[in-house]
């Protein structure tokens, strides 16, 4: 144990424990948990948020990778109220976790090193997720919510916004965590689109065209997409071949993905 009775944070898990009760209250107010919610908390650590949720929910699930946290979490409530899974959230089958019940509400203070892959892992089951509320590095949140033409706008913005409505709710200073991180954090909300914007057959082509378009940010689309779509193809899609990926909106990337599928069908 370290000061304040907190378990020792482990660098390999990217642990920074939230220690400010007022921030916990803001998180709970943003989530607005209600009886009947199928809520999953990822990375509860010593349980600062978990304890507040237990006062409001008759039952929910936490997923914690660190074995040393498990006994403390299980001591917070009986198993019929708090289901504790010792697991890597990147390997959790969220579709199976949802089962035939209500869509999942997922919340967590995510380690910076796994936040992005974890969000994409959860989005593989977006149809079984009602919403997500995450504490992330502020720089990552800024990139997720960025709009075309801004410096922060990039592959991450386009990909996540294709699946979710996104909103940055509030910024959290480093001093609200222990150990104190070197950067600001931000709390954000992601709500999967209903119905989804991307049909299944377009999801892989969309991911490929977005990755290729942003592969070299300083290059034009005509250069980045050479061998995939010609300058004339781009003009036919009402896209300037001389523009850069960070100027394109979501609809333009949808058109690019559809064009690559049509091209593949013709060849």
Swiss-Prot record:
Binding annotation for S-adenosyl-L-methionine: 16, 18, 43, 64, 88, 109
Major localisation: cytoplasm
* InterPro entries on file: KsgA/Erm, rRNA_Ade_diMease-like_C, rRNA_Ade_Mease_Trfase_CS, rRNA_Ade_methylase_Trfase_N, rRNA_adenine_dimethylase, SAM-dependent_MTases_sf
Q: Name one GO cellular component term.
A: cytosol
Q: What is its EC number?
A: 2.1.1.182
Has keyword Transport?
no
Tell me yes or no: is Nucleotide-binding among this UniProt entry's keywords: no
Superkingdom, taxonomy of origin: Bacteria
Q: Which GO terms describe its molecular function?
A: 16S rRNA (adenine(1518)-N(6)/adenine(1519)-N(6))-dimethyltransferase activity; RNA binding
Q: Name the UniProt key words of this record, in alphabetical order.
A: Cytoplasm, Methyltransferase, RNA-binding, rRNA processing, S-adenosyl-L-methionine, Transferase
Q: Which SUPFAM superfamilies does its entry note? A: S-adenosyl-L-methionine-dependent methyltransferases
State the reactions this protein catalyses. Answer: adenosine(1518)/adenosine(1519) in 16S rRNA + 4 S-adenosyl-L-methionine = N(6)-dimethyladenosine(1518)/N(6)-dimethyladenosine(1519) in 16S rRNA + 4 S-adenosyl-L-homocysteine + 4 H(+)
Its subcellular locations are:
Cytoplasm
Q: Which family does it belong to?
A: Belongs to the class I-like SAM-binding methyltransferase superfamily. rRNA adenine N(6)-methyltransferase family. RsmA subfamily.
UniProt function note? Specifically dimethylates two adjacent adenosines (A1518 and A1519) in the loop of a conserved hairpin near the 3'-end of 16S rRNA in the 30S particle. May play a critical role in biogenesis of 30S subunits.
Identification of the protein by name: Ribosomal RNA small subunit methyltransferase A
